[in-house]
């Protein structure tokens, strides 16, 4: 498995002829400004406009004229027709948003006659793809190297350096640490560009046109451009070469217009709640007093120009939420056009749904359950569901967990489907390639903890979930689904095998239509997994609750043990231990962010003597890892959820020892 790489082969394609001579410098070994080739120095080209955002100027392309931004490859490949085997491409771009499943081309080299894509750089919401044509005796194949890059689609400027050397592909973003990929298929040594054409921001047609801003697009033959750019005081706007028209101020004053200094320019600033941002408000400012931020209307979107950075200052109690009984799990979710809700999984015969009203949760609906352990909210198309994991059998002695469906007419959840489970602890809902799944964590059947947990698949024909795959588990407590690039993973928290809590929890990867074992972790009464991402780094945290073996005498300190954070190591193709954190019978991790800071809060439930133990908030400190910053008094803490409203950010936790859940407000400064 290569977490950040997918190599895709398509059916053999007819390829243009290529030279048979050895490689020689077909271009000058200097930075070749691709943008300057298509934009005159005065900027007078139809089909593009110059836009300034965050103090920097970029080009915005028009759907009407993709061919305008193109030129023949022979213009820069003057000596021969071979693309260099070693090179780097530098791009400075701004992408405000990108709809799901949309792909936009930053650069392509296309054979004029056959319309073959010889080389391309393509952006999707979560990945940057480098495409090239590879030939052998069987024909020609298009190959794709994909880098995970969700941080690019944030409305800010970023400078990327893609360096290629045979089978090694490297991507550096904003002078950060490079992401290297060792590909099975190297870049070809003899890629002919005879009769080809460079296209900026498109693949020769309107479909896939790059709709963001591009400021820099440079090809550097023969070497990696990173040392020329980095380090930089302003890494997102590091410059190797940009067109003159983007360096100087654009536009000329009218004959009767007097040039003003910037501080004398008349601008319109709107105060109050967020106003509309349309063509009418284009280039106007809005000051948000509540967030202390200044925003500029650009292309139907308010772009932050100046904003105070939020930092977590302290945590204060906001609401004591009385529940029907002790609460074993909580689920916060939103229903469009209806509001924000929290579902509580209560120990006794009734669980509840609460609605956020006037800055607090109020009772909305009671639902009969049987020692409910967890709720899971999910959607399929326009359908909204809520699944409960029941731990005990019903009045007839039958064990069922129930899926409820939201009624848009009644504005309530109504029973939809019952599924036979065995002391269910958790549901996990996920989607893979457009198909919907539910995984149940079956904890035990009678006294037997070594039983199968089940993955169910939605059948669009019957509109029901049907058993799709069984996985052997040992006292399963939690499932967690996540994706890395094109790969889908499912990790289970195994708690007890009948004799010991020292059992392995397993990570599964989906291959050929089913989940297969990928990696095993030594765990101690594992109760929860939490996956999260910081920048390009992917982490997996396990909550260890108890170190116990039937052959050993119970000790109080067996609850005070390390929980572990693992980090994905792409080279090793595995998660490796990143940090140990001492916890007290930890039952849950919750990851959240405030401004530019990242946090983890742990649900500490028992220290061997008392259930009144502090749960801890940890802040990400870079190379130091997570460091404790806040201590929160809790009683039998079982579950944490983070959520936000227009009024601010909050945490809510459930107690397994008292009929009270608490809502905490995160105060920022």
Curated annotation (Swiss-Prot):
Signal peptide: 1-19
UniProt keyword annotations, A-Z: Cell projection, Deafness, Disease variant, Ectodermal dysplasia, Glycoprotein, Hearing, Non-syndromic deafness, Repeat, Secreted, Signal
Protein name: Thrombospondin-type laminin G domain and EAR repeat-containing protein
Main location: secreted
PANTHER family: THROMBOSPONDIN-TYPE LAMININ G DOMAIN AND EAR REPEAT-CONTAINING, THROMBOSPONDIN-TYPE LAMININ G DOMAIN AND EAR REPEAT-CONTAINING PROTEIN
GO annotation (BP), single: tooth mineralization
Family matches, as InterPro entries: ConA-like_dom_sf, EAR, EPTP, TSPN-like_N
Associated disorder: Deafness, autosomal recessive, 98: A form of non-syndromic sensorineural hearing loss with prelingual onset. Sensorineural deafness results from damage to the neural receptors of the inner ear, the nerve pathways to the brain, or the area of the brain that receives sound information.
Transmembrane feature ranges: none
Localization annotation: Secreted; Cell surface; Cell projection, Stereocilium
Keyword Phosphoprotein: no
Effect of residue 490 to Q: In ECTD14; uncertain significance
Glycosylation sites: 320, 468, 497, 556, 569
Function: Plays a critical role in tooth and hair follicle morphogenesis through regulation of the Notch signaling pathway. May play a role in development or function of the auditory system.
Any one GO cellular component localisation term in the record: extracellular region
Mutation effect (residue 444 to W): In STHAG10; uncertain significance
Impact after mutating residue 585 to I: In ECTD14; uncertain significance
Result for mutant: residue 618 to N: In ECTD14; uncertain significance
Residues covered by the Laminin G-like domain: 58-277
């Amino acid at each position: 498995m290569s977490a950040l790489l997918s190599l895709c082969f398509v059916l053999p394609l007819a390829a243009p002829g290529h030279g048979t001579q050895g490689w020689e410098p077909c271009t000058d070994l200097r930075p070749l400004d691709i943008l300057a080739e298509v934009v005159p120095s005065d900027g007078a080209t139809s089909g593009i406009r110059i836009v300034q955002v965050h103090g920097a100027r970029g080009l915005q392309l028009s759907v009407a004229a993709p061919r305008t931004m193109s030129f023949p490859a022979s213009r820069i490949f003057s000596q021969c027709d071979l693309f260099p085997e070693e090179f780097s491409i530098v791009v400075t771009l701004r992408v405000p948003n990108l709809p799901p499943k949309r792909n936009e081309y930053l650069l392509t080299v296309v054979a004029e006659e056959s319309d073959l894509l010889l080389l391309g750089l393509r952006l999707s919401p979560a990945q940057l793809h480098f495409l090239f044509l590879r030939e052998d005796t069987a024909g020609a194949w298009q190959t794709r190297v994909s880098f995970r890059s969700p941080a690019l689609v944030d409305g800010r400027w970023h400078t990327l350096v893609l360096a290629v050397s045979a089978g090694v592909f490297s991507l550096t973003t904003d002078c950060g640490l490079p992401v290297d990929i060792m590909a099975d298929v190297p870049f070809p040594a003899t890629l002919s560009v005879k009769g080809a054409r460079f296209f900026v921001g498109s693949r020769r047609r309107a479909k896939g046109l790059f709709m963001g801003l591009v400021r820099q697009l440079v090809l550097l033959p023969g070497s990696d451009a990173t040392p020329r750019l980095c380090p930089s005081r302003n890494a997102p706007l590091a410059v190797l070469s940009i067109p003159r028209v983007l360096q100087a101020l654009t536009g000329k004053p009218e004959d009767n217009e007097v040039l003003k200094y910037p501080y004398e320019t008349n601008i319109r600033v709107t105060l109050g709640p967020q106003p509309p941002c349309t063509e009418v408000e284009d280039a106007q400012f809005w000051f948000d007093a509540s967030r202390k931020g200044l925003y500029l209307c650009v292309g139907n979107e308010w772009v932050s120009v100046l904003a105070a950075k939020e930092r977590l200052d302290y945590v204060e109690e906001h609401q004591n939420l009385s529940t029907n009984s002790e609460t074993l799990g909580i689920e916060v979710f939103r229903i469009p056009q209806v509001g924000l809700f929290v579902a509580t999984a209560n120990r006794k015969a009734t669980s509840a749904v609460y609605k956020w009203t006037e800055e607090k949760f109020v009772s909305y609906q009671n639902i009969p359950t049987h020692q409910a352990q967890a709720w899971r909210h999910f959607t399929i198309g326009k359908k909204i569901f809520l699944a409960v994991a029941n731990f005990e059998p019903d009045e007839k002695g039958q064990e069922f967990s129930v899926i409820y469906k939201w009624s848009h007419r009644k504005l309530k959840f109504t029973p939809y489907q019952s599924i036979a489970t065995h002391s269910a602890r958790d549901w996990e809902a996920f989607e893979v390639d457009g198909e919907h799944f539910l995984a149940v964590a079956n904890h035990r059947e009678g006294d037997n903890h070594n039983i199968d947990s089940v993955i169910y698949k939605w059948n669009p024909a019957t509109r029901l979930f049907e058993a799709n795959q069984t996985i052997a588990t040992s006292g399963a407590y939690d499932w967690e689904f996540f994706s890395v690039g094109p790969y889908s993973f499912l990790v289970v928290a195994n708690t007890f095998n009948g004799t010991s809590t020292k059992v392995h929890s397993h990570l599964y990867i989906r291959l050929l239509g089913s989940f297969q074992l990928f990696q095993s972790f030594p765990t101690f009464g594992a109760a929860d997994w939490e996956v999260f991402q910081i920048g390009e780094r992917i982490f997996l945290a396990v909550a260890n609750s108890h170190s116990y073996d039937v052959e050993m005498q119970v000790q109080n300190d067996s609850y005070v043990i390390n929980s572990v954070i693992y980090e994905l190591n792409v080279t090793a193709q595995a998660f490796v231990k990143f940090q140990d954190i001492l916890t007290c019978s930890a039952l849950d991790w919750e990851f959240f962010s405030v401004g530019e800071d990242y946090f983890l809060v742990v649900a500490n439930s028992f220290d061997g003597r008392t259930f009144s133990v502090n749960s801890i908030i940890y802040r990400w400190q870079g190379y130091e890892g997570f460091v404790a910053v806040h201590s929160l008094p809790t009683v039998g803490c079982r579950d944490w959820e983070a959520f936000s409203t227009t009024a601010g950010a909050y945490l809510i936790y459930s107690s397994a020892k008292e009929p009270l859940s608490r809502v905490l407000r995160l105060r920022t400064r």
